Every structure is written in C-alpha cells, then in structure tokens.
Amino acid sequence: MKISLPAFEKAKVLVVGDVMLDRYWAGPTARISPEAPVPVVKVEQLEDRPGGAANVAINIATLGGSASLAGIVGEDETADALTLGIQTLGVEPNWHKVAGKPTITKLRVMSRNQQLLRLDFEESYTQAESEALLAKTLPELDKVDVAVLSDYAKGAIISPQSFIQAANAKGVKVLVDPKGSDFSKYRGAYLLTPNMSEFEVVVGKVESEADLVAKAQGLLEAYDFTAMLVTRSEKGMTLITRDQPELHIPTVAREVFDVTGAGDTVISALATAIAAGSDLPQACAIANTAAGIVVAKLGTSTVTRLELIEALSLSHGETGFGAVSEDQLAYALEQAKLRGERVVMTNGCFDILHAGHVSYLQQARALGDRLIVAVNTDASVKRLKGEGRPVNTEDRRMTVLAALASVDWVVPFTEDTPQRIISRLLPDLLVKGGDYKVEDIAGGAEVMAAGGQVKVLGFEDGISTTAIIQNIMANQ
C-alpha cells in the first residue's frame, strides 16, 4: 500500500516532558594522553542540539507541523542555548524554571564519527516541580489536536494523570514515550511507544510474537490504552490495538550509524501524522520510515517532509503494507472506504511476473484509487497448474507484486478460486484478465449484489508464464 503523507501543516501538537541539550565536542584524535591511557581529542567543532522532549518538538516543526513545548530548565547558560536552538527552528518554549538545578545536558566527545565519552549534567526534579509544569500546560490543550508526553524519567512527568484526564475531556489524544517499570501512571493515554527493552521491563521476557501481542493486549485492557506501538530495532515495529489484528511493520533502515533520538523521531512523526488526519496504520508506517532515515544520521537529528517523500518513493513495498494478511486488509479497506477511495481487486497466480502482467495491473489500477491483488498460495497453484509449479514461492511472488507502483495490497488465498475472499472484501470493482464472461468470474455475483461492478480486461497477446517456461526449457 502506498503511504500518503497528510498535510503536516495542519498538525497542532503540544509536547511536554524532559527537555535537554545535546552538546557535541568533536575533533581529530592522533595520540594518547601522557597523563592516562586515554585518547586526546583536539576539539575543533562545538555544536548544540535540542534533545529529549525538545527534539520531539523540533522534529514536529521540521516535518511542517506546529509544535509548542513545555519543560523544566535551570537558570543557566544551557537553558539559554536550548531556548535559542528551538526558537531558531520555529518552536516557542513554555519553561518552568527551577533555581539551583542545571538544565539537563548530555555532552558527547566525538572523533572520526565515533562517540568516545558522554558526560551527563543533571539533577532529578521533584513531584512539586513536575506538578507545576503540568498545571502550567493545561491551557495549551485548547489549542492542539495531539499531546505528547516525552518521559525520560528525569522528573518532568511523575504523575501525569490530571493532565491525561484533562486532555481526554477535551478530545486531545495523548501519545506517550514511556519510561520506567510502571505504565499505570499513563492510564487513559491514547498510545504508548515503548521500545522492546522498556516493554520487557514492564511485562517480563517476551518469548514469541504471540506472547508480545498477548502481553500488550493485557496492558491495553489494564490501563485503558487505545493502542501500543512496540519498536523492536532490526525487527521493525508492532502495532497492537484493542479491536484489530496486530500489524507488524518491518524496518526500512539500511544503515545504522547512531540510534540517538530515534525514539523521539518515532513519536514526533506519529503525533504529527495523527494530528494531520492519518489513521494509525498509516501514521505508524510514516514513523517507521522516519526512524529509518534518522538512524542513518550521526547524533540527535531531525527528518524533513522531503526526506520522507524520497524515502517512501524508494522503499515502496518495504513498509509492511504491500503484502498483508486477510484481516489486516479488511481493516485497511474499511479505512479506504471511509476516505471515499474506489477499490479495485483482481487475482491470479502471477508465477513469473512479465510485461503482460505489469500492463494488466496498470490498467486495473487506473480504474480506481487502490488496487488489491489476491494471489494463489503455493498449494493452490500446484493444484491448478500441476507438478513443477509454482516456479516462485508465494512469498517471492507477493514481494515482487508489492513492489509495483500500481499495486497497493497483496493478499494470499488458499482455495482454488478467490470467491470466498472476494465475498468478504467486496471491492468497488472486480477485474479479471482474459476472455471470461462477467457472469463466470468468481466472486462477481457477490460484488454486483453489493452494488459493485465487474469488468473484463484484455491481456497482451503472445505473453504468458507457460510460454516463458516452455521457451526457457527449449533453450536449455
């Protein structure tokens, strides 16, 4: 499924949490110190970047959304540097200033694109300081569609229940990047985005995919969350909701240089997409792509809308939406129909994809907004075509089909005909290639009874999988 970026400029998001300054000192290393067995870095570059909740806010602004930021800072030079950093990027701060405590700073010493040392300057904030911050932000809820709680366990978000309840009362969705062993303090939030380590701190060791889903569902029920997105490093992400099948989204990252701030990027992209009108699966796919971009950068970084567009155009078919299960597709179709999109469906074995197939699928896609391709499983192809078929396994056939620009979803079916799955999905238009009569097309009667249409398209003459196989064998 192609991912449509929403109008990010419509997104209005409030970010509350642990703000910090990521400071970088970088330079070459050519010798070992005579004082101790450590490298000497000749510092040639100084750079400050907003970090923590501040990084979430500037990611939203960089994508094109409107972000307001609330956090706790000290009365120091670091707070001034942080303020300047976010204002330069279009984010206005709403600080609760605390005397006698430093603004949280993480100083990284770098050489040859490698981190040699990190120094942390911080003191935890008190319950009273946290409550003062959250109370200060409540009026901002009238101005936004989504609120983000960015919790780094530094004390800015200790007991956020009053904030979450106030947001819910105003219809503002609360997204949480959580920390700690107790998720009950986030009760009532719309969505949590723990990474796998954070998730296992709460639920214990995850033994399997099914175990992950079951434990996440337990948290949704126990704490009244609507959804949970578990980020899983090289395994991608898993979205669990209360009433839909889980959605596994494979990673799109090809190179990983630095995971600093990757979690900030995920929740900022999610918040911006949701505030701009994307549904959850689309928002998660956007966040997954954004994370794949940012981990290829060094240090705390942001992602632009242009980078997202370029990445999505390059990685179509790798976002986890191309090849889907029947249940996932049924949910996606509901969302497509709510958006008023015209859905076209076709089916076939597509054993060896050739020019005739590509032309046919392009014709089918041109008849609507979305195209479903239902593919016979290996067992089904063997029954229909005989021994030696299929040449390509179903996962390979589905992968190739999903990579086509004309194809939105690819779904397998086990029967000899797609009548059952067509009857369940009921597309707006069912198409079939060849010399079929409309009344003979499997699932056609059900589609027409539901108000849909059935159409026969022509294949290009002289091109077929069977002919290709015969030609290959004749030339061996």
Swiss-Prot record:
Instruction: Map out region (Cytidylyltransferase) in residue numbers.
Output: 345-476
What cellular-component terms does GO give this entry? Answer: cytosol
First and last residue of the signal peptide: none
Q: What is catalysed by this protein?
A: D-glycero-beta-D-manno-heptose 7-phosphate + ATP = D-glycero-beta-D-manno-heptose 1,7-bisphosphate + ADP + H(+); D-glycero-beta-D-manno-heptose 1-phosphate + ATP + H(+) = ADP-D-glycero-beta-D-manno-heptose + diphosphate
Q: Which UniProt keywords apply?
A: ATP-binding, Carbohydrate metabolism, Kinase, Multifunctional enzyme, Nucleotide-binding, Nucleotidyltransferase, Transferase
User: So where's the catalytic machinery, residue-wise?
Assistant: D264
> Which InterPro entries does the record cross-reference, listed alphabetically?
Bifunc_HldE (IPR023030), Carboh/pur_kinase_PfkB_CS (IPR002173), Cyt_trans-like (IPR004821), PfkB_dom (IPR011611), RfaE_dom_I (IPR011913), RfaE_dom_II (IPR011914), Ribokinase-like (IPR029056), Rossmann-like_a/b/a_fold (IPR014729)
What's this chain's function? Catalyzes the ADP transfer from ATP to D-glycero-beta-D-manno-heptose 1-phosphate, yielding ADP-D-glycero-beta-D-manno-heptose.
Q: How does it assemble?
A: Homodimer.
Mind telling me what this protein is named?
Answer: Bifunctional protein HldE
Taxonomic path: Bacteria, Pseudomonadati, Pseudomonadota, Gammaproteobacteria, Alteromonadales
Q: What gene does the UniProt entry assign to this protein? A: hldE
